Amino acid sequence: MAVQVENTPVNKPVEVGNETALLLKDLKENGDYVNSKVFPSLIKASIVNESLGKNILVIDLRSTNEFTEGHIKGAVNKKFSELPSYFETGIKPFEYDKIILVSEDGQISSYTTCLLRLMGYGNVYSMRWGMSAWNNRYAQEGWLKGVSGKYETKLENTVNERPSSNGMPDLRTGLQSGPEIGTTRFRKLFEEGTADIFITADEVFSNPQKYYIINLDRKDKYEDGHIPGAVRYKPEGTLGYTDEMASIPADKPVVVYCGTGHNSGFATAYLRLFGYDAHTLKYGNNGFMYNKMVKQRTALSWLPFTQAEVNNFEVVK
């Protein structure tokens, strides 16, 4: 069954499946997180460090070996797949002022934070830059190794038009209420894990035509140079709007990218919730046009990862 959903007075109604409409309605009525002032929910390492010993919980999503070799004092180590049950029965989430997710470079924690926020946990944050911002050891192993200017000469300035709206993926859970549909979709995403979430610049630039590429950034940044074929979507006013989302192909792999991979991680979580085969580009623009970002940092307010982002905070074993 198709349902017409009209978001704005100027755009024609978009037909979406009944389950999609119910889930959209439920998320909108419960805070419309992706269009709120707290989206994306990122927190600086310096604030996390200042908050240690206070009423916060740090959840480290890295592997057991990485956690054992060194972690933030007081942090607990949890696998991505364990989080739903941990939040339901392992802790009382709302007794904490903040729950902070930490990963190697802030990419997985951004994706995960969005899912948990959409599930109703409104005090969850992702630590920006991940452990790379905590001290130099992790920066050398993470972000400073990940930045690259490898494809700066492969960018284009063409303004690529969006395709016509073709609806959104059918969710097909067989359920008839927004909350039930959401619960089933969240469970599925956590069961699927994170192995298929990320994509690298090498993969994208080797065959950009294979993907529908979404540039999630300002117009001036997009027009100054972007991945060939990329289509710009506004960082605000895209997610949750069917007239925007319906132009994203449901039958093609989708790559979402921004400056750092943080915002695109949040957006990718939302798109995957609604059935898109979406992937976030690891490190964002930092992973393929880093030198250009550094040179134009002031002119276009880019956010390249530099040594200035790295702190000297201690870890414990």
Regions found by a protein language model. Give the residues of each.
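Structural motif
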Residues: L57, K98-I100, Y212, P253
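A short acidic-Thr-Gly-centered motif at the start of a beta-strand
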Residues: S46-K54, E203-N207
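Short hydrophobic beta-strand that contains or immediately precedes a catalytic carboxylate
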Residues: L57-R62, A75-K78, Y212-L216, A230-Y233
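Mature N-terminal segment immediately following signal peptide/propeptide cleavage
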Residues: S36, N49, K54-L57, L61-R62
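Short, surface-exposed ligand- or partner-binding patches at beta-edge/loop junctions that are enriched
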Residues: V102, Y257
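A mid-sequence, solvent-exposed acidic-amphipathic segment
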Residues: N207, L216-D220
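Rhodanese-like catalytic fold shared by cysteine-dependent sulfurtransferases
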Residues: M1-L42, T68-K98, Q107-D196, Y222-P253, ...
